[in-house]
Structure formats: structure tokens, C-alpha cells
């Protein structure tokens, strides 16, 4: 019979629980603030995150639906639907991949770029307690 505990995993102590609680609290405050910023701009937080991940993919200016699904931790079909909603809103466009016809690249439109930069600037202003994001000079 199993006790429910996994072998090799120590139970957290009081200080660790306090640290986890503080982290979750700060994370939730940030997410709520992000929801407010995005909503005021007329987009959802998922749309903002998609725009951020398209532009924030290392080494290029686009991403595939599969890559976006991974970054969003979402199902590929749900991510494809989100891309379609962003495309209908004029924020992104799909382009066939020249080297792999099975892949479709998602690119920001000019409107999507403007929206992303505006929202990212507002988010960056609130990253103060997250110094690890930009280093000490980014806040």
C-alpha cells in the first residue's frame, strides 16, 4: 500500500512554504496586473503572450504554432485557434515555411508589433520586483 509520498522527496519546511507562498503571491499580483493592462488595450492576456512569444523567439522574428503552444503550455489545436483570433484582429499573419512545407510561420503585423511594444513597455514598468528579468538596470 502506498503512503502517497514519493521516495526521495523531502517535505518542505516552514521557511520553504513561506517562500513558496510569497512567490505565488507576487506571481498572482503580476498576472492580475497583466490582465488589467491587456484588457485596457483591448486584447486578452493570451493574445499578448502570443505576440510576445512570436517576437521573443530567440534568433528570429517568427514562431511556429507548435513552438507557440509549447511556450504557452497549451494544446496545439487551441493555440492554432488563438492564432486565428489574432489573425482576425489583424495582429499576426501566417506564412508558409519555405524550407518545410509542413510548418507555418506566425509573424506579427505592423498593428501587432505596435500593440506588443505598447503592452511590453507597460509590463516592463511593473517588473521592478522581478529584477532577474532585465538585470539591475532594467527596472
Which sequence ranges carry the predicted segments?
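Charged, amphipathic alpha-helical coiled-coil/dimerization segments
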Residues: 5-7, 84-139
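N-terminal helix-turn-helix DNA-binding core of bacterial DNA-binding proteins
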Residues: 33-75
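N-terminal leader segment of winged-helix/HTH proteins
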Residues: 1-41, 89
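Pre-recognition alpha-helix immediately N-terminal to the DNA-recognition helix
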Residues: 22, 49-53, 114
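Short, hydrophobic-biased segments on the C-terminal half of alpha helices
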Residues: 65, 83-84
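Generic structural concept
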Residues: 24-27, 55, 109, 138
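Residues within the DNA-recognition helix of helix-turn-helix
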Residues: 78, 82
Amino acid at each position: 500500500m502506498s503512503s502517497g509520498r514519493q521516495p526521495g522527496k523531502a517535505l518542505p519546511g516552514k521557511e520553504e512554504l513561506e517562500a513558496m507562498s510569497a512567490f505565488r503571491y507576487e506571481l498572482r499580483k503580476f498576472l492580475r496586473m497583466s490582465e488589467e493592462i491587456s484588457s485596457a488595450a483591448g486584447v486578452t492576456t493570451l493574445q499578448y503572450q502570443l505576440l510576445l512569444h512570436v517576437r521573443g523567439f530567440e534568433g528570429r522574428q517568427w514562431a511556429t504554432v507548435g513552438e507557440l503552444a509549447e511556450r504557452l503550455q497549451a494544446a496545439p489545436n487551441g493555440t492554432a485557434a488563438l492564432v486565428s483570433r489574432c489573425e482576425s484582429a489583424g495582429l499576426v499573419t501566417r506564412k508558409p515555411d519555405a524550407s518545410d512545407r509542413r510548418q507555418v510561420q506566425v509573424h506579427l503585423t505592423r498593428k501587432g508589433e505596435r500593440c506588443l511594444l505598447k503592452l511590453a513597455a507597460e509590463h516592463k514598468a511593473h517588473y521592478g520586483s522581478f529584477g532577474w528579468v532585465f538585470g539591475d538596470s532594467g527596472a
